[in-house]
Amino acid sequence: MGDWHRAFTQNTLVPPHPQRARQLGKESTAFQCILKWLDGPLIKQGILDMLSELECHLRVTLFDVTYKHFFGRTWKTTVKPTNQPSKQPPRITFNEPLYFHTTLSHPSIVAVVEVVTEGRKRDGTLQLLSCGFGILRIFGNKPESPTSAAQDKRLRLYHGTPRALLHPLLQDPIEQNKFMRLMENCSLQYTLKPHPPLEPAFHLLPENLLVSGFQQIPGLLPPHGDTGDALRKPRFQKPTTWHLDDLFFTLYPSLEKFEEELVQLLISDREGVGLLDSGTLEVLERRLHVCVHNGLGFVQRPQVVVLVPEMDVALTRSASFSRKISASSKNSSGNQALVLRSHLRLPEMVSHPAFAIVFQLEYVFNSPSGADGGASSPTSISSVACMHMVRWAVWNPDLEVGPGKVTLPLQGGVQQNPSRCLVYKVPSASMSSEEVKQVESGTIQFQFSLSSDGPTEHANGPRVGRRSSRKMPASPSGTPAPAARDLAATQDSPVGPGLSLSQLTASPLSPALQSSSKPPLQPPDSSQSPEGPQLQAESVLESRVSHLEADLSQPASLQGTPAVEHLQELPFTPLHAPIVVGAQTRSSRSQLSRAAMVLLQSSGFPEILDASQQPVEAVNPIDPVRFNPQKEESDCLRGNEIVLQFLAFSRAAQDCPGTPWPQTVYFTFQFYRFPPETTPRLQLVKLDGTGKSGSGSLSHILVPINKDGSFDAGSPGLQLRYMVDPGFLKPGEQRWFAHYLAAQTLQVDVWDGDSLLLIGSAGVQMKHLLRQGRPAVQVSHELEVVATEYEQEMMAVSGDVAGFGSVKPIGVHTVVKGRLHLTLANVGHACEPRARGSNLLPPSRSRVISNDGASFFSGGSLLIPGGPKRKRVVQAQRLADVDSELAAMLLTHTRAGQGPQAAGQEADAVHKRKLERMRLVRLQEAGGDSDSRRISLLAQHSVRAQHSRDLQVIDAYRERTKAESIAGVLSQAITTHHTLYATLGTAEFFEFALKNPHNTQHTVAIEIDSPELSIILDSQEWRYFKEATGLHTPLEEDMFHLRGSLAPQLYLRPRETAHIPLKFQSFSVGPLAPTQAPAEVITEKDAESGPLWKCSAMPTKHAKVLFRVETGQLIAVLCLTVEPQPHVVDQVFRFYHPELTFLKKAIRLPPWHTLPGAPVGMPGEDPPVHVRCSDPNVICEAQNVGPGEPRDVFLKVASGPSPEIKDFFVVIYADRWLAVPVQTWQVCLHSLQRVDVSCVAGQLTRLSLVLRGTQTVRKVRAFTSHPQELKTDPAGVFVLPPHGVQDLHVGVRPRRAGSRFVHLNLVDIDYHQLVASWLVCLSCRQPLISKAFEITMAAGDEKGTNKRITYTNPYPSRRTYRLHSDRPELLRFKEDSFQVAGGETYTIGLRFLPSGSAGQEEILIYINDHEDKNEETFCVKVLYQ
């Protein structure tokens, strides 16, 4: 309970003024205030003389100007040092975010910011001084209008302390009061703006509480990334439900005596006379308030229940219940207790040490009218107005323990309680023992249990009405909770996590080959690959990857057959999986016709020119590329301008003709280490005169859309340029960039610009961009845009078909959605070389770092950094000119007697000294008369005295810093600096040659300050790295002595040199920011002002290794500078998953021997597979299997709240020591709101989704990924009112049985932003087939066939029927609906469309009634011969 008490006592709030009535009809407004920096000379010279070690911080308090009342709690920033550089003006930087919310929206409510300095007195005590304050206006002059300015503002500061605001002469507006003295040249830079993302967290933060964004709030998760601001976009911990039963109170010494004394004391307190008859006041009710408290405030309104005496319950219940209560209250020594007859349920508990359950016992008293024999006066006690809290208790449950019984002591008296009200006194404890003190105030006892049905409120905050009733609560394991109470018996104890079933297979050549009936093409011979052995070695793994997910739930045969059909979790797989691109992926083999090529060339696409304004040489994408790294590095054109030109997007012939074609598209990709690119929306303009549909047809060109929505078809295409020149690349990075172009495949995701749904992905190799000495080169590609759809087949009826833990495959359909026409170019540019340090040289690849220990100090100034390293003669300089700290001390000493005003006028010591010298020169020139000579002598005397004082200060300063400076120079003499160029997951191996510089032996302890840098302790691992790098230094067995968690030790003989093997390996990457919305339109003016090729920052890392002998003395220091380099992403996986659940994936690797260029292991054995993940919160592992068995990489990752996107990398190794990754995968997990729908194939199922309006009016439209099976009402554009609630009606008619996943997006059509997104999980069962037919058709027949079938109305009345089919592309009806009288027969006309290939198809015909409910289903088997 310490954590709760600590949070509770540290967050005590002063309430607002009683006259400032809380406006209950208004909502609380959230604010974010960022205090950036202080400008100006705030600290006076007198403070500098009086205090040392000066530091500064800010304090913020809410203040009511009208009632002159401070309220809330004073918030403090972190303490910052005041010793700033000598620049003008002085600045102290804070950059701290402050958050709060309040309902007191009135201009008189302000925030007072106080500047406080703290320092040490001469006796060592801490002294706090106020240096000024400012008045920050939260609300505008108009009431209820919060300030909306988000830009930086300056807050003027005033002399004095905020206590001056309590003076009666300071009236509003206080800024214009004559008593307020403004501080010149002093201000505070800040921003203040409303912060709506804080609104879901109002239940965790009390009103008027000022909190920092860096403060840990109980109930909130830590923020993503390294910003540390948890309130900028709050993320909530998942709540759990706790149940309390058999609750009763025991009061001391007995319930009767306790209540009798309480009534008598209340009567005495109210009447002010002696004890009266207790009949004038009686107990009406005994209430219990129960609520969850997070240390800051109550999470929800308390639940109020009524307690009754134990005997009252026993008289109204059965004998068994009476025995139960009597047994539970044996410890009360026969005393009567207060019992709760109901069950308590607390769904808002969170697994956090500061969360506690608060119990408050309240008594309600009744004063009968005329109890004393007279008429009731207006001042008498009313019948229900007398309520008093008498006891309270706090329980901090351990959420990891199981159900049990708890007994808590009750508390009372003057100590603080969560309700901040007066509590009835406790008995005197002066003569009591510790055991008696625990029970003499009373006890509370109850049974508790943790519910397994999961929370009933949304994890984003358990606010009333926040979650729509259509969604079922999700359990911690991801299994939906039962919809009825009858299911609780089995659903409360799930036997397994209920994993979903999925399988994905991608072809190594073209992903479209999976859906084709033709046999797959044979992979090319690796010996004939034009890429050479170097690229073959990089292509260890490629595109054949399978996804498997095991169903660990126990089958029905093991559970027993239940009486009720239980709800089953819908197995989930993503709708769109990425095309898995590998090193062998090529552009489509289908070529455009010559007529289409002419049409493409004549469309007016801008021509790409080289540096000489000449057309760029075009190469054939099927031509081999011979990569010569030396030729690429010796190119005189050091700049590479990479051009990506998007030309056209054509619809594929294999695409379903009923699917609507998008009107606009946009693309997302990432090139090298530039930021992730999201292009503007592009209009698809249909070309006239295109050929007939075929694999090589060209249908639509891409045209940029203007900001007003118009487009000009005369300037088609989108061109993006990336400039990679020596100014962009780091030293030695040219080699990395050439390798990137040679080995990497660029993945481009194609999105619908209107619905923001993923259409598909395409992959293009960039090896043709290697210029190999040419001035420029370009290549045109026609790329297949592929989408992979998953469908769960009908599950087996019997549980015995698939045993426990078996893997069940699902149907995977790979569909070619279209073809993207793309041109890539690389234009060479001549660049100026760098002034110092040539980037032409590759980074140092030396594996041995030498340090012979013979370095020494060659003399020189200890005050000049790097002085001993200088080898040239320089002019002597004054010490104060090269040491700013010494100059500040000399200036402070000079102005010690001039007062703070003179000290604040000039702070530059060098400038002051120059003015002094000029004054002396002028005095000497004017030295003719006696007065001038006398003045000159006095000045010279003053200068000599000043110089003498300066020499004393310099001598004292030198003595103080001598030891530190000598130690620094000696440390530099034994320090070796080295730079590493590391990539994600790659182990950088090197050896440090450590020499013992002494004539005696030493045991050296090796200390490393970075977890990513380690010593290689295993001799086999050391030998492996030596052989891999070709290093021939000595290798020793058992070189280090290990002492548990302490630093390893090494024994060195006198003057001996030993090679220390070290390895640096990092799995951390910077935060990624993928987007699912198109970018703004980029005009030529914008492109000139802000180039598109600005790179993303890759921070430099540092590590230090200390070599320390037994005495603690350092004999060597190794300082490593690690420059992170971009890594190659071989495959990108994009998954869509329900929010706040676990995604469990098993990605199957292909057989090892089928991969060209794969490493060769032992005969008949596959090399081991190891995996690592960049996110420590993701569970990632690869299990070892037997020879010839498939290998699976298992992933388990928690999805966040919708619409969060989580990105991480998976690194795969094929060696035991994790030296070099053979593949790197990027995984993107999209979290969506989940809607489960159970339906029948061919039958319409209706449901409604609740839409909640934002703060403004928005014109929105609903889009779906399967418009043939899911319809919405309204179908077009409609208005979503602000803060309103509106229903979106959805109609689902699946065509086939099984489980499918449909995306539903609500998009703002004006700004093309995603307002809401759902993942509709369809669980569709097949209706009963009443009749079956079979026909035969000629394959390739262009005419088709007409057939007829009959249907008899089984009802006695006339009925209307509707016809539907699961294959509308193969079967059409003569009439979509018909009417038939009762008992009559109707003939249905069928039109079977031709098929281009031989085979057989089963077509279902659904006959529905007027309400679209299925009446009968026919099956027609069509044989194409």
Curated annotation (Swiss-Prot):
Stretches for region Sufficient for basal bodies localization: 822-1425
Entry keyword set: Cell junction, Cell projection, Cilium, Cytoplasm, Cytoskeleton, Phosphoprotein, Tight junction
Compositional bias segments (type: Low complexity): 473-484, 507-530
Subcellular location as annotated: Cytoplasm, Cytoskeleton, Cilium basal body; Cytoplasm, Cytoskeleton, Microtubule organizing center, Centrosome; Cell junction, Tight junction
GO cellular component: bicellular tight junction; cell-cell junction; centriole; centrosome; ciliary basal body; ciliary base; ciliary transition zone; cytoplasm
Protein family per UniProt: Belongs to the NPHP4 family.
PANTHER family per record: NEPHROCYSTIN-4
Name recorded for this polypeptide: Nephrocystin-4
Source lineage: Eukaryota, Metazoa, Chordata, Craniata, Vertebrata
